[in-house]
Amino acid sequence: MGPCGALGLGLLLAAVCGAAAPELHTLRYIQTAMTDPGPGQPWFVTVGYVDGELFVHYNSTARRYVPRTEWIAAKADQQYWDGQTQIGQGNEQIDRENLGILQRRYNQTGGSHTVQWMYGCDILEGGPIRGYYQMAYDGRDFTAFDKGTMTFTAAVPEAVPTKRKWEEESEPERWKNYLEETCVEWLRRYVEYGKAELGRRERPEVRVWGKEADGILTLSCRAHGFYPRPIVVSWLKDGAVRGQDAHSGGIVPNGDGTYHTWVTIDAQPGDGDKYQCRVEHASLPQPGLYSWEPPQPNLVPIVAGVAVAIVAIAIMVGVGFIIYRRHAGKKGKGYNIAPGSNPAI
């Protein structure tokens, strides 16, 4: 099946998209259980993403897996949906128990609490396969599966009993098999199902600009209108990535099915020419580099002033010439020969 079977304890909500690459594909399931979801809201929700696109959804109100894309609705049969629904209902029941266990372990008697899981895999054609299985409680890391060492990592003391229990119950073997076999098999199948949509490529339109205030030059790089969702936008200074100094706005969907994102970085006013924005996306044959160009001095007022001066001079010359002609004409009338007079001899 697509999602794993009923799970034990266990993840912090992580990015749905993987690193940008021409043939990278990702499958992610994010599962959330809440003690206090709010009026009219389901307390348990699972969503699935292929290449960053939401394709399935389950919640504790409907209690069924439902499609969120046309391609999965068209390709998956009823047996698939019945099987996924059975898994969703099993995970829902286990997370109801998990919320109670964690509240007792943390000595909590009430309040709003949340368990989050993220699990899935990435495949890069001709490259490595990566798998993830993590858990968080109340927004903090709780435990994660290390596929390399076949162990679970306890991020907090309260997670140690869970780590021991899972390792004694052979959970590492089960999750290794899921992440390397089952997950990859279903990801390839989903990519085949949705190849017409998932294979679409829209190049990002990139704009770089800067704004100086209080002695700091803030450089911004915005990529707009790209598809698929995975993208890497980073700032370079003298050719070196400045990841820790940059701030990202996240990847946000547009109304037309594409996405946009932006990344900013602060620099010294005189260092703007040392920075470049690098954009990596499946639609680009190679990473694009974009530089900030400082605005040129505004020549419009100068040109306008010169033009006004030229016009003024022209008007003055014209007026002066007219006055001169009129004055010269008046002098000429006093010396004209009278009509019919003979010339002097």
UniProtKB/Swiss-Prot annotation:
Region of interest: Alpha-2: 111-201
Topology term for the membrane: Single-pass type I membrane protein
Extracellular side: 23-301
Region (Alpha-3) location: 202-292
Annotated InterPro entries: Ig-like_dom, Ig-like_dom_sf, Ig-like_fold, Ig/MHC_CS, Ig_C1-set, MHC_class-I_related, MHC_I-like_Ag-recog, MHC_I-like_Ag-recog_sf
Transmembrane found in the keyword field: yes
Regions that span the bilayer: 302-324
Domain Ig-like C1-type: 204-293
Stretch forming the signal peptide: 1-22
Chief site of localization: membrane
Location in the cell: Membrane
Keyword Glycoprotein: yes
Annotated keywords: Disulfide bond, Glycoprotein, Immunity, Membrane, MHC I, Signal, Transmembrane, Transmembrane helix
Disulfide bonds: C121-C183, C221-C277
Chain spans, region Connecting peptide: 293-301
Annotated glycosylation sites: N59, N107
Biological-process GO terms, alphabetical: antigen processing and presentation of peptide antigen via MHC class I; immune response
Region (Alpha-1): 23-110
Pfam families per UniProt: C1-set (PF07654), MHC_I (PF00129)
Entries under PANTHER family matching the protein: MAJOR HISTOCOMPATIBILITY COMPLEX CLASS I-RELATED GENE PROTEIN, MHC CLASS I-RELATED
Subunit note: Heterodimer of an alpha chain and a beta chain (beta-2-microglobulin).
Main function: Involved in the presentation of foreign antigens to the immune system.
Family named by the database record: Belongs to the MHC class I family.
Name of the protein in its database record: Class I histocompatibility antigen, F10 alpha chain
